[in-house]
């Protein structure tokens, strides 16, 4: 019970950190530099910019982003995971609040620097939310749903969507803004990949003398399937051992090491990154 309470409060804190960081990235770096974000936020930016330029009407970006997230959050509630969606809702609401109360101001005048610093802040904040078992809303929800249902990524669709937004922004407002926007999204994506270890799969081969004790503990704690290979022999010791074959998230490795050491401190573990799986891999 205590662990669940700590986990719940830590996720709320992380949602707040995300909202603050992404609002700083947006209001201090991207918006003053006319740099367009990716996903729903970038689409809303483009629509607001077009309306302001051709109609003269100023609209609230945070409010429109919140409105566009509502149907996506409903989809997430029913089709992904309600616990996941609860904290995603918190992140989306806090982001709307922070983006509204933090003033837009120019911190740097170099647009390339603004794109890169904003990208690092944005990507890092997105990565920590995904690592904590919830998302930032928007197109992330669609991507997670498709990956959960089919095991496939729709990254190419996201790239096409973002390219369309940035192309239109460049065509209407100037091609330099399209370049800065693409740079910002690229840096943000690299930061997400660096921070978000939960969705990076690794293959683990564990050679042990204590498979009977290890298997139930690992399955209960990590919620991962394990394949046991019997009757293997070490070339040096000539002793019979067993191999445990596991596919897990990179995030699981620290906990996995702790569990193994408590049962078999002489176990040998080999880790291989960059593993692709089908739909039978648990994420949320």
Q: How would you name each of these model-derived features?
A:
Residues 23-27, 55, 117, 158-161, ...:
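Positively charged, small/polar-rich N-terminal and surface patches that mediate targeting and assembly
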Residues 1-211:
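Core subunits and conserved enzymes of cellular information-processing
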């Amino acid at each position: 019970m205590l662990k669940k309470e700590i986990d719940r409060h830590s996720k709320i804190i992380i949602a707040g950190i995300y909202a603050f960081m992404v609002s700083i990235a947006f209001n201090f770096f991207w918006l003053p530099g006319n740099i367009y974000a990716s996903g729903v936020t970038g689409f809303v930016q483009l629509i607001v910019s077009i309306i302001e330029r051709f109609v003269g009407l100023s609209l609230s970006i945070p409010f429109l982003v919140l409105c566009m997230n509502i149907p996506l959050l409903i989809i997430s509630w029913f089709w992904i995971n309600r616990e996941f969606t609860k904290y995603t809702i918190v992140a989306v609401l806090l982001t709307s609040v922070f983006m509204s109360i933090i003033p837009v101001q120019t911190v740097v005048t170099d647009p390339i620097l603004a794109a890169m610093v904003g990208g690092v802040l944005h990507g890092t904040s997105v990565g920590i939310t995904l690592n904590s078992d919830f998302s930032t809303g928007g197109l992330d929800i669609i991507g997670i749903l498709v990956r959960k249902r089919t095991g496939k990524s729709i990254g190419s669709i996201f790239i096409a969507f973002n390219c369309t937004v940035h192309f239109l922004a460049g065509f209407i407002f100037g091609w330099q803004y399209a370049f800065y926007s693409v740079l910002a999204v690229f840096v943000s994506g690299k930061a997400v990949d660096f921070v978000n270890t939960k969705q990076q799969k690794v293959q683990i081969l564990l050679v042990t003398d204590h498979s009977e004790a290890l298997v139930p503990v690992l399955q209960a704690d990590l919620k991962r399937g394990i394949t046991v290979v019997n009757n293997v022999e070490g070339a040096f010791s000539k002793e019979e051992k067993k191999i445990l074959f596991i596919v897990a998230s990179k995030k699981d490795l620290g906990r996995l090491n702790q569990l193994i050491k408590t049962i078999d401190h002489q176990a040998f573990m080999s880790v291989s990154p960059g593993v692709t799986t089908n739909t039978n891999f648990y994420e949320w």
